[in-house]
Amino acid sequence: IKFQANVFCGLANIYAPVYRQIHIHGYKDNNNGLKAFDVAYKDIENAFKYYLNHFNNGNRIVIAAHSQGTNHAEKLFTDFLLENDSILQKVELAYLIGMPVHSLIKDYPACDDPLDRHCFLSWRTFSHGFYPSYKYSDKIAVTNPVNWRRNGAASLYNSHEGILFRNFKIKHPKSLSAVVHQGLLWVTFESFPMQKIFERNDYHIADYNLFWLNIRQNFYERMKVKVEDEKTN
């Protein structure tokens, strides 16, 4: 919540579900792990339905998730949202971050353009040149959260707005470049003070933090276009 959901503070109302999260080792247990995942997901689905009935009040919806939450959010699409078109039409954006999500979610595609809506955004961040031992392929959807494109050249360092630190300060703008490669987001850092604390291969815990202000500003721009479209119509 502190470093991820708060990217939307002041731009949207934020509702976070309380759920019985599966332990990380449950992902390796094909029996009890799957049962625990189903329990966790059902908590998410019930919380979302409660939100719809008590808090939504006809407003548009943005779904934002990370890691295990992304697995549950993807299942929420396939098991609930895609079966309820009137609710699906309210979902302006989905941030499905930190887990592999394939490009083909029926009737809800990956975003291609910095101002697209009614689509999902996804990325998993690694150091440039690193391949994880688990899934990577061109069939996995990835959006570059600096230039908001799904492919093409690496983003410019000048386009990076900074990194959100644990003290809630944004530091080191223009310090990284990102490029999409085989279902991964590869990042390269420019030299800056304390850079060594960022020297790792897997940036899973910082999937939001590394691009926090880029995410916030882009979200504002997408919603600004929505409001302008509504005024025009």
Task: Label each residue range with its predicted role.
Residues A65-A73:
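Gly/Ala-rich beta-loop-alpha elbow adjacent to hydrolase catalytic centers
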Residues G26, H72-A73, S103-K106:
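Extracytoplasmic/secreted cell-surface and envelope-processing proteins
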Residues E74-T78:
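Short, hydrophobic alpha-helix immediately C-terminal to the catalytic nucleophile
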Residues L34-K42, S67, I205-N209:
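Soluble non-cytosolic domains of exported or imported proteins
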Residues K28-N59:
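Helix-loop module immediately N-terminal to the HCX5R catalytic loop
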Residues I1-H25:
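Active-site machinery of serine-nucleophile hydrolases
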Residues E45-N57, D79-V225, D229-N233:
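Surface cap/lid and interfacial helix-loop subdomains adjacent to catalytic sites
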